[in-house]
Structure formats: structure tokens, C-alpha cells
């Protein structure tokens, strides 16, 4: 059998004696052997999450992620294997600041994981693409790939009936009901508290362990811990809960303002602009419900930036040493303060806040 991944295969029967001949013929015609990349999934289910509000949260985020995958890919999650994800990541890691070469890589990516596209050219880069445009495409494809990978990792295994999805992921999510804690969260949000709906305390064991190991290793103190915001579209939130905010050491560094790092904001308003909330400034959200992350981060000697220069696009952990973060101040270059972290062990999840359009 042969055909596109995700489509019904074209089946013909031939004698085994002509296998090698037919195989070589199809390979020469441009077909690719995907046998080792395909996978078979089970139809088990997870144990139900007990808390109603947490169950509704995870269900909503799964639905948002699933809808994004269905609207972008012509293959389902069950038809994608870990090997295909790895191969797709390898393709993304090869991106440069050369639009022609990058378009060739995009075509390879679309062949590996077929997309729903009326016109492929609409998803490619213009010949004169600026670094920021290239970075936007890299971010677009990386987000979709992480969504797909997270949905795959959410597929139940044989022993799933004994665990909830959160237990499988070493993740704890509990609603914040303490009035003092709620007041503190809202006060920190400032005027943005007008769209506060509810908050959940998040404990990701893997990211927490990395954070506290880094904290101890570098002799940080309590006063070095800061709580800043990170906004993302609804479709990305499940992946962030599962993985945290992680950096890919092989990722191409093309068009980031202060280099490739984790970008956080001291003001909720700045990060809300990146969420799916209706009218959000940066991504033009259209949803009445959106989510904002509060990240716990640690640093004690930030590199302060008051005026941006083009050389700052190539900032890295080693280049800002002995500083351990970038604090870019609002002013001539930025509307709002921004914090950039270059080691993902310095950041872990604290809260996910539900926002409602008022």
C-alpha cells in the first residue's frame, strides 16, 4: 500500500518476487518509505480528574489544542509517531536567515506532516523575508509541533485507567480558593484584574525539580525569586502546562529582540496581549476565555537595558555573564518592561489564571 500520510492508502497486490522492483520504482518516483515512522495507538482512557474546575480546565485546553491541530493538519494525532516529531524538529533546527533555503525546509516539513493548505505559497516565506518574518514562521511551526507532541503524549497507555492525565504527567493543578492568596494575585495584576475569573496553582514536578536544583547550585536566596507573567494562545497552554517554558539548544537564532530566551513581563497587561482574549493587542484574540501564566523565576544580577541596539539580537547566557537575566526597561525602545531568561531551569510554573472578557 502507498499514498499520503493521513489519507486512505492505495492498495494493490503483487507477487512477493517483484517486491524489490516495485519498491525501487516507487522510490525513484518520489515516494518516501514511512514504514518505520508509523505507529499504532491504543484506545484506553485515563482515570477521571476529581475536581470539577480542574477537569473543565484540562478539557477546554485539550479541545483548543485539538481544534488547532485539526484545522492545520490533514493527519490526526494517532497517525503521527515520535519518530516523525523528531524528524520534524530536525528540519526546524536547520532554519537559517536564508528564505530560499528555509522554504525548501518548509516543503520538507509539509511533506512529512501534511497540512491543510489551499495554497502552499501562502505558508512560505517571501524572497526578501526579514529575520523577524523568518522567526515568526519558526515560532508558528514550533508551536504546532509542540501541540501535536503534547496531544500524542496525552494518548492513554495500557495502565492509564489507574491514573489521571495529570498524574501521568507529574502535574498538580488545584483551584486557588484562599481569599488572601486571591487578593494578592489580583493586586499584582493591577488594572488587568478586571478580567480575572479564577486561578489555579500549578506544580510541575519536572520543572520544579530543575528550578530548585538550579536555585541551590547557584546559591540564590528568597529575595532573588520573582513572579512574572507569560501569555500565550489557548491552543499552546496545554503544552506549557506539560512541558513548562523550555528552550531548544539547537533552535535557530534568527529574529528575537534580545536573543533566544524565555520572555516574561512584570505587568499582566503586556502578557495578556499575547493571549487569546478577545481584542488582545499582539495576537488579536477572539475568545471570551483565555489563560495567563504566572511564572516563578530566579535571578539576582540582571543586565539592565534602557536603549535597544541591533547587537542585542544575539544576546545569550554566556554573552550577558556574569549577569543572569536581561531586564529591558520601558522607554524609547519598549512600551513595557520585559525580562529575558536564557536558562529554562531558572523558570517554573506558579499559576495559570483564567481570564474572561468583561
Set out the residue ranges of the language-model regions.
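Segments that shape or occlude catalytic/ligand-binding pockets
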Residues: 4-28, 210-358
Amino acid at each position: 500500500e502507498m499514498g499520503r500520510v493521513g489519507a486512505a492508502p492505495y492498495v494493490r497486490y503483487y507477487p512477493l518476487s517483484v517486491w524489490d522492483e516495485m519498491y525501487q520504482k516507487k522510490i525513484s518516483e518520489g515516494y518516501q518509505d514511512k514504514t518505520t515512522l508509523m505507529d499504532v495507538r491504543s484506545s484506553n482512557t485515563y482515570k477521571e480528574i476529581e475536581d470539577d474546575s480542574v477537569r473543565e480546565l484540562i478539557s477546554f485546553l485539550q479541545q483548543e489544542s485539538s481544534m488547532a491541530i485539526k484545522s492545520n493538519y490533514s493527519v490526526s494525532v494517532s497517525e503521527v509517531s515520535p519518530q516523525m516529531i523528531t524528524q520534524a524538529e530536525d528540519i526546524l533546527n536547520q532554519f537559517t536567515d536564508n528564505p530560499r533555503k528555509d522554504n525548501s525546509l518548509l516543503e520538507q516539513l509539509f511533506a512529512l506532516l501534511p497540512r491543510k493548505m489551499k495554497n502552499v505559497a501562502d505558508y512560505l516565506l517571501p524572497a526578501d523575508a526579514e529575520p523577524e518574518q523568518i522567526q515568526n514562521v519558526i515560532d508558528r511551526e514550533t508551536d504546532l509541533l509542540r501541540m501535536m507532541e503534547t496531544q500524542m503524549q496525552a494518548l492513554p497507555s495500557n495502565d492509564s485507567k489507574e491514573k489521571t492525565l495529570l498524574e501521568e504527567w507529574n502535574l498538580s493543578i488545584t483551584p486557588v480558593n484562599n481569599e488572601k492568596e486571591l487578593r494578592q494575585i489580583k493586586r499584582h495584576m493591577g488594572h488587568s484584574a478586571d478580567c480575572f475569573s479564577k486561578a489555579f496553582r500549578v506544580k510541575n514536578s519536572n520543572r520544579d525539580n530543575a528550578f530548585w536544583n538550579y536555585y541551590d547550585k547557584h546559591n540564590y536566596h528568597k529575595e532573588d525569586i520573582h513572579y512574572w507573567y507569560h501569555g500565550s494562545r489557548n491552543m499552546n497552554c496545554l503544552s506549557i502546562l506539560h512541558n513548562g517554558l523550555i528552550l531548544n539548544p539547537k533552535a535557530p537564532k534568527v529574529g528575537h529582540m534580545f536573543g533566544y530566551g524565555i520572555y516574561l513581563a512584570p505587568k499582566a497587561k503586556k502578557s495578556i496581549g499575547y493571549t487569546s482574549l478577545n481584542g488582545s493587542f499582539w495576537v488579536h484574540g477572539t475568545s471570551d476565555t483565555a489563560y495567563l501564566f504566572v511564572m516563578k523565576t530566579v535571578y539576582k544580577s540582571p543586565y539592565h537595558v534602557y536603549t535597544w541596539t541591533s547587537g542585542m539580537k544575539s544576546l545569550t547566557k554566556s554573552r550577558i555573564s556574569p549577569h543572569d537575566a536581561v531586564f529591558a526597561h520601558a522607554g524609547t525602545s519598549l512600551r513595557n518592561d520585559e525580562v529575558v531568561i536564557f536558562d529554562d531551569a531558572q523558570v517554573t510554573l506558579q499559576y495559570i489564571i483564567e481570564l474572561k472578557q468583561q
